Amino acid sequence: MLKQLLSKCAEGKALTEDEAYAAMNIIMSGEATDSQIASLLSMLRLRGETVDELVGFVRAMRDRMTAIEASDDVIDTCGTGGDGAATFNVSTAAAIVISSLGVKVAKHGNRAVSSKSGSADVLERLGIDIQTSPSAAKQALETKGLAFLFAPLYHAAMKHAAGPRKEIGFRTVFNLIGPLANPARCKRQVVGVYSTCYAEKLAEAMRRLGSEHVLFVTGRDGLDECSIAAETDVVELKDGAIRRFVIAPEDAGLPRGELADVQVRDPEESAALLEAVMAGTAPESAINIVALNAGAALYAAGKAETIAEGVAMAKEAILSKTAYEQLQRLRAKEVIHDA
């Protein structure tokens, strides 16, 4: 069947949602060859993925993933990656801040692929355990308010696409759909996107998949998160409606900062800067970019009425050491019994 679907794509035609679902299922079952996978990814990238295709692919990923039980108010802060900006792990830092304010965070992430430091890499350097099973993640979510969901553990079937993805080297549909398949089935998210041209398609796909409040953010300086050094394009899905707007740091009560203050060379530097942010001793730009992204997440979570209000809450959590205390709680070792 995959050959017929590849032929359809080669003719410039889009796949239906069900065809996309079938194609992804064939890939994840290990029945597709590396050449077939690379061909499909290349054709989709050249033509541009449709909403139907995105929905079909995400449905297939969700159906095959190892899911964890979580309440509807759980949120994720996750990016597509691939922005090449060499920034420290802002979304991971934001996750720690918002979890310190009582918002449960199921942080979906991986090791570095194109970045200097993936969320798994920096958490290890900080001495924070990466939960090794769904039951451990569920317990961490309940007891500490934050669980790290290491993507390969929950999306084991994606290993079949790993080789072709690495060999072709460019961004593919997998970069876009990864953040949309959180194992906790989060309905509220902040998703960093490497190019804002994809944001409306992703928002429409998530609307059809039942999401409640999602912000797709792209800094105009190329960051796949809210930028402190430039305006940020935001596409918002909220209660079934989709709108686009632009937010500048000044709109959230923050001075414009320097990108150089948030760039790092390796996971060790990223961990050190993240810890300095939590301690309130980092450069102002680093503290403020975390506050800005945490503020967006607090807004998506329904904890704040506006992004600006969320930023004020996040800044207070950092300056009052509430976030630093949460970092220490996350570091504390405890016996987690696997079910």
From Swiss-Prot:
| Bound cofactor: record note | Binds 2 magnesium ions per monomer.
Gene3D superfamilies reported for this sequence: Nucleoside phosphorylase/phosphoribosyltransferase catalytic domain, Transferase, Pyrimidine Nucleoside Phosphorylase, Chain C
This protein's pathway reads:
Amino-acid biosynthesis; L-tryptophan biosynthesis; L-tryptophan from chorismate: step 2/5
Residues binding anthranilate 1: 79, 110
Choose any GO biological process term that the UniProt entry carries and state it. L-tryptophan biosynthetic process
Give me the Gene Ontology terms describing cellular component.
cytosol
Where anthranilate 2 binds, per the record, is at: 165
Cofactors that this protein relies on: Mg(2+)
Q: Name the positions where Mg(2+) 1 binds.
A: 91, 225
Mind telling me which residue stretches traverse the membrane in this protein? none
Which Enzyme Commission numbers does its entry carry? 2.4.2.18
Q: Which residues bind Mg(2+) 2?
A: 224-225
GO MF term set: anthranilate phosphoribosyltransferase activity; magnesium ion binding
Reaction(s) this enzyme catalyzes, per UniProt = N-(5-phospho-beta-D-ribosyl)anthranilate + diphosphate = 5-phospho-alpha-D-ribose 1-diphosphate + anthranilate
Q: Give binding positions for 5-phospho-alpha-D-ribose 1-diphosphate.
A: 79, 82-83, 87, 89-92, 107-115, 119
**Sorted UniProt keywords:** Amino-acid biosynthesis, Aromatic amino acid biosynthesis, Glycosyltransferase, Magnesium, Metal-binding, Transferase, Tryptophan biosynthesis
> What family does the Swiss-Prot or TrEMBL record give for this protein?
Belongs to the anthranilate phosphoribosyltransferase family.
Q: Which NCBIfam families match?
A: trpD
Q: How does it assemble?
A: Homodimer.
Q: What does this protein do?
A: Catalyzes the transfer of the phosphoribosyl group of 5-phosphorylribose-1-pyrophosphate (PRPP) to anthranilate to yield N-(5'-phosphoribosyl)-anthranilate (PRA).
Q: Please state what the protein is called.
A: Anthranilate phosphoribosyltransferase
The record lists the organism as Geobacillus kaustophilus (strain HTA426)
Q: Which gene encodes it?
A: trpD
